[in-house]
């Protein structure tokens, strides 16, 4: 084993991380000096809730999102937000400043590999080593999944073996210059990591920041869903469901007076949460992220039924007190700042929740032709989200069932990566692909900034986010997956 020389002080650690490609380096400066050499210390290293998946490089490509007009107008070619919101394919995205999304994904992978590659030689309880490696592999799979779906094409069985993917980092080596793998190879690696680790995970880990078995199976189900293996996705989702099928009843929250009064699902007490991963790491960073990217589009707003508590509990369209983040009269709605507080309610923008497992079960059953089961899973979820009449009738066709599931995914899986990833995978199917049309601005229409119509086609290269130039400079193998 290489001599590591890494120092840390768990949870009060000051990280100064320079990680800009698959062959990058890490420089950690601690407050307290504790050498990582014991099994327990490596195990603690796995739990890192502040993973910081900043969404600015892609989130405004989603038809679920909206933006304050002053953040876009005049910046249509110079910022990620401006380029994405106006679907500007003529802009050069390769010169944009990095928002650290790629860096943070691979920092997390580096952290996992530090455990996987070195814990066998650590001193301490030998029975903890297999668990630690299994947990680290589950999180390593999670970050590779996010990376390949952000920086490469969606998995297409017909082309995945030749489509450019991302670097696979399967061990701890700070000096390696790694090749870029294909999309198929990355998925094979992710699936292998999960299949070999999930049964070793605990049903109830030491704390909420360690992955449990329900998370492992839910992630495996999601990976198989994106891999278009409906039977295996369904089987994994059923195992996750058997371990945790809890849903928060939003009717109870409403009846108790709302989230200001009913705080029993705050912090680590939301039974739906399977993994604690946010867009910016919890705290002021996530608050700003949800303010900046917490505005939903008029289209998504109109998809919520009048009795849908997912809207009435969490959003407002007359948020005059949030004028810095919201354009009144735009037709959009914004996430209530008062609810953006872990002391009131824990909402996962990136991490997995049981609600997503219900939706995976609905989709896989629909894909396999069992519309009755698909309808039942959708209605079980809606029973906890809508007041009054919540049930949908069983659709007559698979297409109608899938259309309903897609709407439920949009209403339930807000922010983070979900809609962006869904658009990419559904755009591979003629029945479900979508051309997004956006008219903008709505409020501040002037001679300088007239209202225009912007269009994003299903095969747009904008759906593949370019690797940051800092990563490409460090690793010549990391060629772009787009022609730009």
How does the language model describe each region?
Residues 32-37, 63-73, 153-162, 203-288, ...:
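Short, surface-exposed recognition loops and adjoining beta-strand edges that mediate ligand/DNA contacts
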Residues 81-151, 181, 199-204, 344-349, ...:
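Conserved, well-structured interaction surfaces
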Residues 43, 50, 227-228, 234-354, ...:
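Extended ligand-binding clefts on enzyme/binding-domain cores
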Residues 22-67, 300-305, 313, 389, ...:
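Membrane-proximal, proline-rich intrinsically disordered regions
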